Swiss-Prot record:
It comes from Cupriavidus pinatubonensis (strain JMP 134 / LMG 1197) (Cupriavidus necator (strain JMP 134)). InterPro entries: Nudix_hydrolase (IPR020476), NUDIX_hydrolase-like_dom_sf (IPR015797), NUDIX_hydrolase_CS (IPR020084), NUDIX_hydrolase_dom (IPR000086), RppH (IPR022927). The gene is rppH. The keyword Hydrolase applies. A motif (Nudix box) lies at residues 38-59. This is RNA pyrophosphohydrolase. Pfam families: NUDIX. The lineage of its organism: Bacteria, Pseudomonadati, Pseudomonadota, Betaproteobacteria, Burkholderiales. Accelerates the degradation of transcripts by removing pyrophosphate from the 5'-end of triphosphorylated RNA, leading to a more labile monophosphorylated state that can stimulate subsequent ribonuclease cleavage. It comes from the Bacteria. Keywords: Hydrolase. GO terms for molecular function: pyrophosphatase activity. CDD domains: NUDIX_Ap4A_hydrolase_plant_like. Residues 6-149 form the Nudix hydrolase domain. Its EC number is 3.6.1.-. PROSITE patterns: NUDIX, NUDIX_BOX.
Length: 231
């Protein structure tokens, strides 16, 4: 569903815990990290779409979170032609997003990455609110910065503190290795040893991914992905 200007309505979610740390999800089989987000279906309000995406992507229910704030208006970004499927070039321009800031009211163990048959993430972590965005694909960096900046006014303390290590959780719950890798950064050689997740999430076949979306939803790749139509 596109608006008259060629933008797809979408919601983005910045989920914070009691320490104002932000939730990042690791895309299945990749070293790329993103915020939960997804398109608004016909007839949905942005808030309804947000709750649906929250459950589909990380298994949380409305009682697990509290809405702290949302952006005043749509935040838009355009997608370069090389990242758009040929058959929709000239019609699709990019995404317009309402971003929500949510505070976790539940526990870490309430996060469930396999709430649907087609999970988006195979691991997740909490990170400090302000992190460098160089790893975000270039045409999305401004939207991430705008959303984080606008919504930071709702935080109950100054989040501008030095970056600290954060934990990695695999599958539904459980702790993995702790290291100071920022979202989207490739691991060092010492960090590349296989992780032992509590719950494995089955890989999604690349062929199936390619037909599910116009372009990646808020992906933070280690390097820009060559295939822009992956989900």
């Amino acid at each position: 569903m596109l608006d008259r200007e060629g933008f797809r309505p979408n919601v983005g979610i910045i989920l914070i815990n009691a320490r104002n740390e932000v939730f990042w999800g690791k895309r299945i089989g990749e070293h790329s990290w993103q915020f939960p987000q997804g398109g608004i279906k016909y007839g949905e309000t942005p808030e309804q779409a947000m709750y649906r995406e929250l459950h589909e992507e990380i298994g949380l229910l409305p009682e697990h979170v509290r809405i702290v704030g949302r952006t005043r208006d749509w935040l838009r970004y355009e997608v370069p032609d090389k990242f758009i499927r040929r058959e929709i070039r000239g019609h699709y321009r990019g995404q317009k997003q309402i971003w929500f800031l949510l505070r976790m009211a539940g526990r870490d163990c309430d996060v469930h990455l396999r709430a649907t048959e087609h999970p988006e993430f195979d691991a997740w972590r909490w990170s400090d609110y302000w992190v460098p965005l160089e790893a975000v694909i270039e045409f999305k960096r401004d939207v991430y910065q705008l959303a984080l900046t606008e919504l930071s006014r709702f935080l109950n303390r100054n989040p501008r503190v030095p970056l600290s290590p954060y934990g990695v959780h695999h599958g539904r719950h459980g702790s993995g290795q702790r290291y100071a890798q920022q979202p989207g950064q490739p691991p060092t050689l010492a960090q590349r040893r296989p992780l032992q997740p509590v719950t494995q999430v089955a890989p999604v076949a690349p062929a199936a991914e390619a037909v599910q979306a116009v372009e990646s939803d808020a992906v933070l790749p280690a390097t820009p992905a060559p295939n822009p139509t992956e989900s």
